[in-house]
């Protein structure tokens, strides 16, 4: 019983799978809930290099961080640190809780624009900014549908030196716009 539709490999009988601390139960109607062997705090923090991120299990299975993105965060850091531009502007679309936003800002981007359709995720990203002591860095937080935001930026003539995108396969914008990656 594995709730992720992306799991394509056969289940193994490795005894380590019986030592879980938290188990996510997916609902057939969407969402779900976590089951924990022992009581956990509502949230906790983890460190990634010099940054601190909030972790909190959600009813849609996520925890606020995708650790498998660390390789991409290292790449972002390397590219920003080696960039010869004077004013480095980075655009992070579908920015979620802002781990890549914080990485780009900490690496030296002069401005990072963080765009996500979910106000709750943008608020979480602001918490990650504070936890990582980046309040004095120029980070713009935008709650908007990504396509609508990009259309506005095009009309404004705004350009960026780098664009970070990790779109979901399906999602809804702040005004119920549907996003489907096909």
How should each PLM-predicted stretch be described?
Residues 1-65, 74:
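Non-catalytic substrate-recognition/targeting regions of SAM-dependent transferases
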Residues 67-86:
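Conserved alpha-helix/loop element of class I SAM-dependent methyltransferases that forms part
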Residues 85-96:
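Conserved class I S-adenosyl-L-methionine
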Residues 97-110:
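Conserved SAM-binding loop of SAM-dependent methyltransferases across substrates and taxa
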Residues 111-116:
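Conserved SAM-binding motif I beta-strand of class I
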Residues 117-164:
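S-adenosyl-L-methionine
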Residues 167-168:
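Switch II (G3) loop of P-loop NTPases
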Residues 178-182:
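Glycine-rich S-adenosyl-L-methionine
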């Amino acid at each position: 019983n594995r709730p992720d539709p992306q799991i394509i490999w056969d289940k193994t009988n490795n005894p380590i799978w019986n030592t879980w601390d938290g188990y996510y139960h997916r609902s057939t109607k969407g969402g779900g809930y976590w089951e924990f062997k022992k009581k956990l705090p509502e949230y906790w923090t983890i460190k990634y290099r010099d940054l601190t991120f909030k972790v909190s299990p959600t009813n849609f299975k996520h925890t606020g961080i995708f650790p498998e993105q660390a390789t991409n965060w290292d790449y972002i850091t390397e590219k920003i640190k080696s960039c010869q531009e004077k004013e480095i502007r980075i655009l992070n679309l579908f920015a979620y809780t802002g781990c890549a936003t914080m990485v780009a800002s900490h690496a030296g981007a002069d401005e990072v624009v963080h765009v996500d359709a979910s106000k709750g995720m943008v608020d979480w990203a602001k918490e990650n900014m504070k936890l990582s002591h980046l309040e004095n860095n120029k980070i713009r937080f935008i709650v908007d549908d990504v396509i609508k935001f990009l259309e506005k930026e095009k009309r404004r003539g705004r350009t960026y030196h780098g664009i970070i995108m990790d779109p979901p396969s399906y999602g809804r914008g702040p005004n119920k716009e549907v996003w489907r990656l096909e």
